[in-house]
C-alpha cells in the first residue's frame, strides 16, 4: 500500500469531524480506499463514531490468518470515500456490532459460518446458510472447528 500524508483523496472535501480519524495514525491509500491497520480496534467505538458521522457499513471482508485467527476488514462509505479498518480476531472471537448497526447482522452470521468467528455480545447467531449438523468454519483450511 502506498502511504499518503493527507486525507482525503480524489478531491473530496472532508469536514472537521474527519480530522478525528487522524491520518498521521497510519492511514494508507490503496486501491481507491483508505486503510488503517488497527489490531487493537474497538469495533463498537469505531461503529458508533462512523454512524455518528452518517457513514454506511459496506461489508466486512474476512480472511483466515495464522494461529486460528481471522482478519476482519470493516469497509465503510463516508461521504463517497471508502474507509477500511483492518483488524484480527482474538482467540477466535470479536465483539459484535450488530446491535449498533443492523446491517452487520447478516455479515457477522456469514463470517461465523465460513470462518467460525464467535461474535460476542450477540443475542442469537441463527444459521444463515449452514445446513443442520454442519459446524461453522467451512472456509478454514483446517475445515470446520470442532
Predicted regions, residues:
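Terminal low-complexity/charged segments
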Residues: 1-146
